[in-house]
Amino acid sequence: MSPRRKLSDARRRQILKAAVQVIAEKGLCDTGIKDVADQAGTSPALVIYYFGKKDVLLAEALSFADERFYAQTAGAVAALASARDRLVELVRCSCSVGEAEDDFDEWVLWLDLWARAPRDPDVARDRAAMDRRWRATIAEIVRAGQATGEFAALDADVFALRLGALIDGLAIQVVLHDPEVSRERMFELCMDTCARELGFSWTTENQAAVTQAVRRSAPDGRAAG
């Protein structure tokens, strides 16, 4: 890759990172191109050059946040020996349990994306692609657990659809600050569903063991995510 291309890609990532922060804080309707440019330390003209309009910026910002999520969790999940532990860690990361408050920013962007998808075919296409990837990730772990006898026999794709929908629904309540649905409660409800449908035992003690295993595998000794 040429130095110019590297610089161009770096600027684009810088703008996307800024867009995630600003849209999560203000919402897409109240976010202007200048707001993103100011956060990124660049000009509005450059933001328009890369993305053209806000809907494109939203979709690409969420895709950027999605890639960041997979990059942060892939190593931690892969390092765990059992499919059950990999599923537990994947769900924990999606619930942002034990993470900083702004680690839930991606879910705030999803709300804006869902609101726009019915009226914008491009946004709808991006939404569908990200959901397919997420469900496939869940289904892959389920099939691995079925192959080792850890999980009960069921349709992995249908289970992934149900779990993905449950996570989405509970995440909305967390974003809305529902007093009955904290991130920890979201995680517990998701894991109760996983354990019941897949036929394995899960307790908070199980989660502590998974967290310790993730920390041992992380280069700096901290849980990934």
Regions picked out by a protein language model, each given a short descriptive name:
Residues Q14, V22-V56, E60:
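Helix-turn-helix
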Residues R86, E101-A124:
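Amphipathic alpha-helical segments used for helix-helix packing
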Residues R11-V20, V36, A61-A65, F69, ...:
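Generic hydrophobic, amphipathic alpha-helix propensity
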Residues S2, G52-V56, A78-S82, P118, ...:
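Residues in soluble alpha-helical coiled-coils and helical-bundle/repeat scaffolds
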Residues R4, A124-A128, R132, Q146-C194, ...:
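Hydrophobic/aromatic-rich alpha-helical bundle segments in the mid-to-C-terminal region
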Residues E25-C29, A79-L80, T148:
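Short coil/turn segments at alpha/beta junctions that flank glycine-rich nucleotide-binding fingerprints
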Residues A18-A19, A40, G145, A160:
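Small-residue (primarily alanine) positions within well-ordered alpha-helices
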Residues E60, A74-W107, F159-L163, F187, ...:
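Hydrophobic alpha-helical connector segments
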